[in-house]
Amino acid sequence: MSESLLIILGDGPTFASAIAIAKRAHPTSVLRTERLMPSDIANTTMDFLDECDPAMTSVFAAIGMHALNYARFDLWAKLRLRGMRIASLIDPSAHVDPTASIGENCLIESGVSIGPNATVAAGTIIQSGVGLSADAKIGKFSWIGMNSTVGAGAAVGSHVVLGAGVHIASGVTIGAHCEIVQPGLFAKSLNEGTFISPQFTEPARVYRVAAVSPASSSNLMWQGTP
């Protein structure tokens, strides 16, 4: 019988983190790594996947950090179109409640705690030391920075970036495409596209996504006040 094969595609810190977690979490699987820069995603054919047994192969799109949420989405979409089985990687030191739901192509790093009935949608990266309380929800292709927390019943939308040390209070809603890079407690809900940085004294730089192509992030268009 063939051994299971795990292929990790990507580059940068997320790529390195995914490889380390895969070695700890799946020591009996054959691990193959393929470096792929975000700028190469639109043109890559990934022909090497044709040589793999689909029944025994899982893949993980390990491209990340903040604005690269969209590049990770593009790579995931190409893998889905090829009919590949897509893995999630969870560090053995993380605690995931049995009632929690983790989507495909999620990376859960060391020391993470995910509470009862919490939901983490596809493509999301959760860095080390993050805590998600009961019934918390994280949308697709988001990035949750280290030592951040999301309170009970709080909802974080898709394509959101929470920087390190950001704490979302219970019951708060963070709209899609928000970026919060200022550490601290956020007890009020934020509209879609809100950007919060230490450079500003109040929420600023509101953007709205006009179009997102699953085939290429080059078709990503932003509208709003810079």
Kindly give the residue locations of the regions a language model identified:
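Extended, small-residue-rich solenoid/repeat segments and analogous flexible loops
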Residues: D50-G131, A136, F141
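Glycine-rich hexapeptide-repeat left-handed beta-helix
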Residues: G145-P226
